[in-house]
Amino acid sequence: MTEYLLLLIGTVLVNNFVLVKFLGLCPFMGVSSKLASAIGMSMATTFVLTLASVLSFLTNEFLLQPFSLEYLRTMSFILVIAVVVQFTEMLVQKTSASLHRALGIYLPLITTNCAVLGVALLNINEDHNFIESAIYGFGAAVGFSMVLILFSAMRERLAAADVPLPFRGGAIAMITAGLMSLAFMGFAGLIK
């Protein structure tokens, strides 16, 4: 039980996919200008990342390995992710049309979010079992969501601040992301 908790904390804080592994930067920069969109994207990505992580593990364990098809791993994981994202998009469209409009193109782009594929591949490379895969996927999603929401809140405050002209827009956003990454480096000694 302790190792599962350490895996979760390690994935959320110590090895954050956005700030440490630099995965998922496209939605991190693209959706973070408004807090409401960031929260919606966080919920959708959490659902997709967790479900895709589990389904990718099952695909690898019961389809690819028994038939020696490991060379199709990346392509099959992309297919699994695309199906999960399509299901999520239909679910969001039915439950919240306003959120679907707010997320716009970024919802289908979860398919190409390198963090989702990265989690699926790292689960296999790190030889996680089913429970560890689910925890790793959920932890990566929580870490992504936490960083996205924090960054979005900071960007909203920066939009109202008196930022010098050369630093407005993307420049101050990159500086802020770098400072967040430095802050998360403080968690490096948390788990050994």
UniProtKB/Swiss-Prot annotation:
Membrane-spanning ranges: 5-25, 38-58, 72-92, 102-122, 134-154, 171-191
Keyword Kinase included in the entry's annotation: no
GO biological process: electron transport chain
Family, per entry: Belongs to the NqrDE/RnfAE family.
Subunit structure: The complex is composed of six subunits: RnfA, RnfB, RnfC, RnfD, RnfE and RnfG.
Role this protein plays: Part of a membrane-bound complex that couples electron transfer with translocation of ions across the membrane.
Protein name, UniProt field: Ion-translocating oxidoreductase complex subunit A
Record lineage: Bacteria, Pseudomonadati, Pseudomonadota, Gammaproteobacteria, Alteromonadales
Gene that encodes it: rnfA
